[in-house]
Structures are given as structure tokens and as C-alpha cells.
């Protein structure tokens, strides 16, 4: 792990020795000039997909942090700085690193940046592994049914996360990825912004209830294939 400061910017890298141009890894233009941008995804902002296997051993996804909701229309990407470790990018990087080391199927964190601004503000970026040959669960469920065993596997995945006492504050069907690996499916969890460790067990049922609401919402909105039987199978996996 490498941490550096350059003027008003702070960087965290998932390697030990400095690399050429590493502070420019957060600029889409830097990657565009090298012809390494392979695609984009649109959310609150643009996620840039990068061809970086030769650099990092994996392809990468570059994301700038943006606010959502009504506040995001007024203040798109400025956050209040309290400490470096509490910034959005550094906190997500640290959590992903912990989960990755624990063997959880989450994107490997590659680098994080915090740019301090005047009046106690900051902006943030993160560079993570791109999960290949994958689509989010809602996209899959629009055209296919999952097997009972697949639902149980998703339940087991969430139980593993909860056993580590990690609360995914935005646990929903869009943040579960389905990856095709040698004719088998592997399930990943995404988007750990604002997530973290939580003691006790009281919150776990609430977290599962949040996930179920997201399935019901997308069943009504997008027509995804989801039944009460599917949910029961997910719970079986979670409980076993």
C-alpha cells in the first residue's frame, strides 16, 4: 500500500512502489489519449471502463463521487472534510481492501484520490477492478429466471458479508452482479460507498428487508422475474 500527498491532493494506491504517471490515473483524458477506454456506464456520473490488464493485472473502472437527490442538484460533488480516513474514496478503498482480503467477491480496489478544496470541502475519485463478463441482477432477471440454487447462493453471499459485520447501506438488486465463469455463475457485490462495520445483529433483518423491497420495486417497474418462492430460497441460503 502506498500513500502520498501532492499539494492539496491525497492518494492511496494498492501497490508498494511509485509508478509512472500514477497521480494522473484519475483523469479520463489521460486514459483516452492512450486509447485505453473500453466503455462507459451512466449513473449519477460516468464510470469509465479501462483496459489496464498490463498495468494492474485486471481491467479497471474509474468513478468520480457525485451526490444524489435534491442536494446533488445544488452541490454535485463537493463533500465536507472531517478526516482523510472518513472521505468517501479512502473509506470505500479501505473497506474493499478488507473484504477482498477476506475472500469476498468484491472488486479489488486499485487507487483512491481526495482533492481538498477551500472552506473545508473535498472531491473524491476511486479506481477499482472491473468485473468482466458480468451484468447486474436486474438486467438478467428481465429475461431469465434464476434457479433455486442460484437464489440460495445469493443468500449465502449476503450472510458472509453480515458475518463480517459489514452493513451494505445500499443493498439492492442493482448492486449484485452475475458473472459468467466457465459456464458457471459467480455472484459479486458492488458499490460500498458509505458502507461499513456495524456491531450487533439487529440491523441484519432490516438490511435483508431493504433488499427484498428493491426486488419488489423492480418487479413492478421493470418486470423482473421475482417471486415469493425466490425470496424464500434466498433466505434458505442465508440461514444455512
UniProtKB/Swiss-Prot annotation:
Keyword Cell inner membrane in annotation: yes
Keyword Lipid metabolism among UniProt keywords: no
Catalytic activity: an alpha-Kdo-(2->6)-lipid IVA + ATP = a 4-O-phospho-alpha-Kdo-(2->6)-lipid IVA + ADP + H(+)
GO BP, one annotated term: lipopolysaccharide core region biosynthetic process
Places the protein is found: Cell inner membrane
Entry GO CC: plasma membrane
Major localization class: membrane
Topology in membrane: Peripheral membrane protein
Pathway(s) it belongs to: Bacterial outer membrane biogenesis; LPS core biosynthesis
UniProt xrefs under InterPro entries: KDO_kinase, Kinase-like_dom_sf
Record: active site: 170
A Pfam family reported for this protein in Swiss-Prot or TrEMBL: Kdo
Enzyme Commission number(s): 2.7.1.166
Superkingdom of source: Bacteria
GO molecular function: ATP binding; kinase activity; phosphotransferase activity, alcohol group as acceptor
This protein's UniProt keywords: ATP-binding, Cell inner membrane, Cell membrane, Kinase, Lipopolysaccharide biosynthesis, Membrane, Nucleotide-binding, Transferase
Family: Belongs to the protein kinase superfamily. KdkA/RfaP family.
Entry-linked HAMAP family: KDO_kinase
Free-text function comment from the UniProt entry: Catalyzes the ATP-dependent phosphorylation of the 3-deoxy-D-manno-octulosonic acid (Kdo) residue in Kdo-lipid IV(A) at the 4-OH position.
Protein name per the record: 3-deoxy-D-manno-octulosonic acid kinase
Organism of this sequence: Actinobacillus succinogenes (strain ATCC 55618 / DSM 22257 / CCUG 43843 / 130Z)
Encoding gene, per UniProt annotation: kdkA
